[in-house]
């Protein structure tokens, strides 16, 4: 397994344990839950097809434009986030998976959060084990400060997870709208070119008479 330190040195954004990919909530991609996005997702693959069909029959370009207007503007399109259940939040298991260098792709800002938390956790662990030999066994069994530190670390870890979810939702929303905009601007351009050609042909026919 690769370590986070070596990952930082090589400037990689991946850590490693493919067998945990399905279980780790960090691997899940969260999408916008607004009505516009939900209705647009199944239509998205048809945009380039309708554009190509429009070369033979411009009506398909009109269909693209109408779908763009109806799905992206008529429908509610304010950002809506996934309603996370309690069991979807990362717990100590996922936190341990990160500290043990399970490899998952993370955003740079999330990596920064994890590095800060890891340094904080490592420093506390060193202090704890240095003083361990001089402590009575009763104190070793229950260490309130360590539990509080772990809870604090988990809260920060969950906060980083929420930032990741927010980033995913915003990215999916913007990407979907950008895709619709690009293909439908092409459709609009195709209609304009066809209109200009029709007008040009009509004028030529009138002059030839």
UniProtKB/Swiss-Prot annotation:
The chain crosses the membrane at residues 50-70, 185-205. The modification Phosphothreonine is found at residue 153. It is a multi-pass membrane protein. Induction: Induced by alpha-pheromone. Repressed by the ALPHA2-MCM1 repressor. Residues 71-184 are cytoplasmic. One of its GO terms (cellular component) is membrane. The keyword Translocase does not apply. Keywords: Membrane, Phosphoprotein, Transmembrane, Transmembrane helix. Its main location: membrane. The modification Phosphoserine is found at residues 121, 123, 125. The keyword Transmembrane applies. Residues 1-49, 206-209 are lumenal. It is found in: Endomembrane system. Required for receptor inhibition of inappropriately expressed a-factor receptor (STE3) in MAT a cells. Inhibits signaling by relocalizing the G protein beta-gamma (STE4-STE18) subunit to intracellular membranes. May also be a mechanism for the down-regulation of the mating pheromone response after the zygotic fusion event, promoting the transition of the new diploid cell to vegetative growth. This is Protein ASG7. It comes from Saccharomyces cerevisiae (strain YJM789). The gene is ASG7.
